[in-house]
């Protein structure tokens, strides 16, 4: 995911503008911390439904230290929002260059984000040339691949290009954290 975002950030920088990123699901805030530290032209909104997760990330996963060192929260490059990511996205008028779905409930991805409606809402909130990235916990093939199949089908109806970067390329029937990319 970071590689795709880095490339898009360089392109935005070449155009003299910020990269607009929405991260749905903060968790341990690994990606937002990376963006704050290494992608200075990114303006990132992170939506985490559970305030306790944000508190844990601040206290145990060095989120506060990262924000202090980078100044990303103070200068508006990183905004932390405790809300339901799906509802938040639906309420926005903003167009994003990158939407990252890193929201999970156990092993399940954010429910609406694997439906036709979810794909339409994401498409409607992406700027021209924008990209949707999602962590999809699923096998790529076989009986445990239904989630990934549903995501591919729904987003395939809305996007010209959909790809999967499998966690277990040599074991496609093994469930893994696959990266789904739609453009």
Where are these regions (language model features)?
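The AdoMet/dcAdoMet-binding core of the Class I SAM-like
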Residues: 1-133, 139-152, 156-158, 170-175, ...
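Short secondary-structure junctions
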Residues: 160-165
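Flexible, glycine-/basic-rich loop-and-beta segments that form/coincide
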Residues: 183
């Amino acid at each position: 995911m970071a590689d795709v975002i880095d490339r898009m950030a360089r392109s935005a920088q070449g155009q003299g503008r910020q990269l607009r990123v929405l991260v749905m699901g903060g968790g341990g805030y690994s990606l937002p911390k990376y963006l704050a530290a290494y992608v200075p032209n990114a303006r990132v909104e992170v939506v985490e439904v559970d305030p306790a997760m944000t508190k844990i990330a601040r206290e145990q996963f060095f989120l506060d230290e990262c924000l202090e060192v980078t100044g990303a929260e103070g200068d508006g490059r990183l905004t932390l929002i405790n809300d339901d990511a799906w509802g938040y996205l639906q309420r926005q008028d903003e167009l994003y260059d990158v939407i990252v779905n890193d929201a999970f409930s156990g092993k399940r991805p954010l429910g609406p984000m694997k439906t036709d409606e979810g794909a339409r809402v994401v498409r409607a909130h992406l700027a021209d040339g924008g990209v949707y990235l999602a962590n999809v916990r699923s096998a790529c093939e076989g009986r445990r691949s239904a989630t990934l199949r549903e995501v591919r089908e729904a987003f395939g109806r809305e996007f010209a290009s959909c790809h999967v970067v499998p966690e277990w390329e040599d074991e496609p029937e093994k469930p893994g954290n696959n990266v789904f990319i739609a453009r």
